[in-house]
Amino acid sequence: MSSQKIRIRLKAFDHKTLDQSAEKIVETAKRTGARVSGPIPLPTEKSIYTILRSPHVNKDSREQFEMRTHKRLIDILEPTSKTVDALMRLDLPAGVDIEIKL
């Protein structure tokens, strides 16, 4: 398994939970003997939604909301079978989206 590389992409709306999850993954991988590159911060996506404040008139009165999606990238180089097992058992918060590629 040493010739493979595991790439983990994390996404979340809250950057604090995202960083805590990334630290948990890095710590688990290092503890099982794998080399880790990251967490690398990727660009933050910012979605802006503009809506009318009034349901009827006053077109000039609008309100804007934004939603930021923070992302991190972690590469696990030279993973062992213990690393994969430990990552599968890892418990992460519900607000963090994880995408794993081998």
UniProtKB/Swiss-Prot annotation:
GO cellular component, one term: ribonucleoprotein complex
Pfam families cross-referenced by the UniProt entry: Ribosomal_S10
Listed SMART domains: Ribosomal_S10 (SM01403)
Molecular functions per Gene Ontology: structural constituent of ribosome; tRNA binding
InterPro entries: Ribosomal_uS10, Ribosomal_uS10_CS, Ribosomal_uS10_dom, Ribosomal_uS10_dom_sf
Alphabetized UniProt keyword annotations: Ribonucleoprotein, Ribosomal protein
Residue ranges of the TM segments: none
Keyword Cell inner membrane: no
GO biological process, one term: translation
Protein purpose: Involved in the binding of tRNA to the ribosomes.
Entry-linked NCBIfam families: PRK00596.1 (NF001861), rpsJ_bact (TIGR01049)
The family this protein is said to belong to: Belongs to the universal ribosomal protein uS10 family.
Assembly description: Part of the 30S ribosomal subunit.
Protein name: Small ribosomal subunit protein uS10
Name of encoding gene: rpsJ
